[in-house]
Design a protein with these regions (language model features):
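Solvent-exposed, amphipathic alpha-helical segments
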Residues: 9, 25-28, 32, 200, ...
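Residues within well-ordered alpha-helices
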Residues: 6, 41, 96, 178-179
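Internal alpha/beta core interface subdomains
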Residues: 1-17
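Conserved phosphate/pyrophosphate-binding and hydrolysis machinery centered on Walker-type P-loop NTPases
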Residues: 3-4, 19, 35, 172, ...
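Charged substrate- and nucleic-acid-binding regions of tRNA-handling and nucleotidyl-transfer enzymes
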Residues: 150-221
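Short, well-structured alpha-helical segments
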Residues: 4-7, 42, 110-118, 163-164, ...
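Conserved, hydrophobic alpha-helical core segments of structured domains
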Residues: 14-157
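Amphipathic alpha-helical segments that form the core helices of the histone-fold
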Residues: 12, 64-69, 198-206
C-alpha cells in the first residue's frame, strides 16, 4: 500500500540526510516537532532509523522512543523551545548549549532552551518558590508545568502565578540602586565585596524582606 511504499522510500533515502546542511535539517526537524502530528513523524523517524543521520542522534533511538512514551498521546508542544527542551531531557543531555550548537542554532535559541531544561530539572527536585520564579520567569515555568502535566506529574500553575504576582522585581536591572550609586553615595569600593552586597540586596527584595526603595536599601546596608 501507499504507506508501505512511503516507509520503504524513507528508509532508502535516509542516508541522503548526510548530504543536507545541518541548518536545513534543523528547520525540518523543528517543523516536525512543532506539528500537531509530531508523534507520527517521530515514530517514522525511529522506525526508518533516519535519526542515525541527524546531528547528535546517531545512537539515540531508545531515547527518542522514551520521548514518545513519556508524553500524553494527545500532547502537542507549545513552542519550539519547549519541544527541544523536552527532547534534551529525554536524551539526558548535560550540556544543552553544546548539543544545540552542533545543530547550528542561534545563541538566543540555545539560551532559551537551556533555561527551560534547567528549570525543568529544578522542578524535578523541588517545589516552586519566589527565587525559582524570579530566576526563570513565569512563561518558562508554565511551559515546564505543561510538560509535567503531559507526563502525569503534579503541577503548580496557580502557585507560580501567585508567586510571580508577588515579586517586587522581575529582573536585576529593576533594582533602584546599582554599584555606581553605592560607590558614589555610600563610598563603597569596587570589588568582590560590592558584588556580594548587590547580591544580598537582590535576594532580600526577591524574598520580600526588603522593599525596592533607595532609603530602605540604604537602611538595610
Amino acid at each position: 500500500d501507499f504507506e508501505e511504499k512511503t516507509f520503504k522510500a524513507m528508509q532508502e533515502t535516509a542516508p541522503l540526510l548526510k548530504k543536507i546542511s545541518v541548518e536545513r535539517i534543523f528547520i525540518e526537524f523543528d517543523k516536525l516537532l512543532a506539528a500537531d502530528f509530531w508523534r507520527k513523524g517521530l515514530e517514522k523517524l525511529i522506525d526508518t532509523k533516519a535519526y542515525q543521520y541527524l546531528p547528535e542522534l546517531g545512537d539515540k533511538g531508545s531515547c527518542l522512543q522514551l520521548l514518545l512514551d513519556r508524553l500524553d498521546p494527545a500532547f502537542c508542544f507549545q513552542s519550539s523551545e519547549q519541544a527541544w527542551a523536552m527532547l534534551l531531557i529525554a536524551l539526558d543531555i548535560n550540556e544543552p548549549k553544546t548539543f544545540l550548537k552542533n545543530w547550528k542554532t542561534s545563541n538566543d535559541f540555545q539560551k532559551s532552551v537551556s533555561n527551560l531544561v534547567a528549570a525543568y530539572r529544578k522542578r524535578e527536585v523541588a517545589s516552586t518558590d519566589r527565587f525559582l520564579v524570579y530566576q526563570y520567569g513565569l512563561e518558562n515555568l508554565l511551559l515546564v508545568e505543561n510538560l509535567r502535566k503531559a507526563q502525569g506529574l503534579p503541577v503548580e500553575n496557580e502557585q507560580i502565578k501567585a508567586l510571580d504576582a508577588a515579586l517586587l522585581i522581575h529582573a536585576k536591572h529593576e533594582i533602584v540602586v546599582n554599584g555606581g550609586i553605592l560607590m558614589a553615595e555610600l563610598g563603597l569600593q569596587p570589588g568582590p565585596n560590592l558584588g556580594h552586597i548587590l547580591n544580598e540586596i537582590e535576594t532580600a527584595i526577591v524574598d520580600g524582606d526588603l522593599i525596592n526603595e533607595k532609603e530602605a536599601i540604604f537602611d538595610f546596608l
